[in-house]
Amino acid sequence: MSNTTIGKFITFEGNEGSGKTTQSKLLYEKLLDNGIKAVWTREIGGTDIAELIRDIVLFKDMSITTELLLIMAARYEHIEKFIRPNLNEGKWVICDRFIDSTLCYQSENSEEQQLILELHRKLLDNFFPDLTLIINVSPSIAMQRIKIREIHKNTNQLNKFDSRNQQFHQKITDAFIQVSKLFPERIVQINGEPMIEDVSSEVINIINNKMKVNLLR
């Protein structure tokens, strides 16, 4: 089920280097510009405890099951301490990654995806976004953007997902396409390869249509 609070919960998903973080922040800023109360957050993270878990998951080697359980713990903390309270205050919560990333990164097949969804139902009260935007780019473009991003950061410290090969990024891209078919009423796919401004305009169009608002550009 979607959240039943008075605010709106919008998530952005996609491969590393897809531009989802940029687009999520642009939407957050656009909401504020239009007088809509909003907050921006991310997963793994969003609270002090969840951010500590983020560093462990992104930079330490572990089994996929350990990753999953740590992420679920971080998500529970995030929902209870940040997401739900802000939604209950009537704010829009814009989140960079949520359950769909877990379905893509922490599973190898449909059976494992069903296990994740069962955990989500039991542990997190089946809490889903009102709308999810998946930003799609080809794996080759994703890897180019990752390299450019790290140069601009002036650091060689890639997290373990950033540093994977093109085959891995293709697998994640394919997984997001498959997940979008599981939740067609909630998920909209967007081509993230055009200019940032063009992708942002498409995001605004989708938000206006799906959320019944009239955000000015």
UniProtKB/Swiss-Prot annotation:
GO terms for biological process: dTDP biosynthetic process; dTTP biosynthetic process; dUDP biosynthetic process. ATP binds at G14, N15, E16, G17, S18, G19, K20, T21. Pfam families: Thymidylate_kin (PF02223). SUPFAM superfamilies: P-loop containing nucleoside triphosphate hydrolases. GO terms for molecular function: ATP binding; dTMP kinase activity. Signal peptide: none annotated. Keywords: ATP-binding, Kinase, Nucleotide biosynthesis, Nucleotide-binding, Transferase. The keyword Transferase applies. GO terms for cellular component: cytosol. Its EC number is 2.7.4.9. Belongs to the thymidylate kinase family. This is Thymidylate kinase. It comes from Orientia tsutsugamushi (strain Ikeda) (Rickettsia tsutsugamushi).
